[in-house]
Amino acid sequence: MIPGELLIDDGEHELNAGRATVTVVVSNTGDRPVQIGSHYHFYEVNDALAFDRAAARGFRLNIAAGTAVRFEPGQERTVELVELAGDRIVYGFNGKVMGKL
């Protein structure tokens, strides 16, 4: 095995199996594009994005790791979020949580 090498079984792999998801409609009300990465706590994204923030608390985009979603000015789109796993302790981002969810 080479350091960092991944040995993955053949076939389909379901990401985030068994985790709660929520779907929200997001609108970019700003005048600049906003890009959100796969593991960013969605509740704390740029304030120019209008959506049900309470529903997004403790969730991130349900997309592959290392990818992102871009919201152009005036654009509205529906995204699926998946609950954060692990200890569910959030620090940093925009400082809106700074502790346990």
From Swiss-Prot:
Pathway: Nitrogen metabolism; urea degradation; CO(2) and NH(3) from urea (urease route): step 1/1. Pfam families: Urease_beta. GO terms for biological process: urea catabolic process. It is found in: Cytoplasm. InterPro entries: Urease_beta-like, Urease_betasu_sf, Urease_subunit. Keywords: Cytoplasm, Hydrolase. The keyword Transmembrane helix does not apply. Its EC number is 3.5.1.5. GO terms for molecular function: urease activity. Coiled coil: none annotated. Its main location: cytoplasm. One of its GO terms (cellular component) is urease complex. It catalyses: urea + 2 H2O + H(+) = hydrogencarbonate + 2 NH4(+). The keyword Cytoplasm applies. Heterotrimer of UreA (gamma), UreB (beta) and UreC (alpha) subunits. Three heterotrimers associate to form the active enzyme. PANTHER family: UREASE (PTHR33569:SF1). HAMAP family: Urease_beta. Belongs to the urease beta subunit family. This is Urease subunit beta. It comes from Paraburkholderia xenovorans (strain LB400). The gene is ureB.
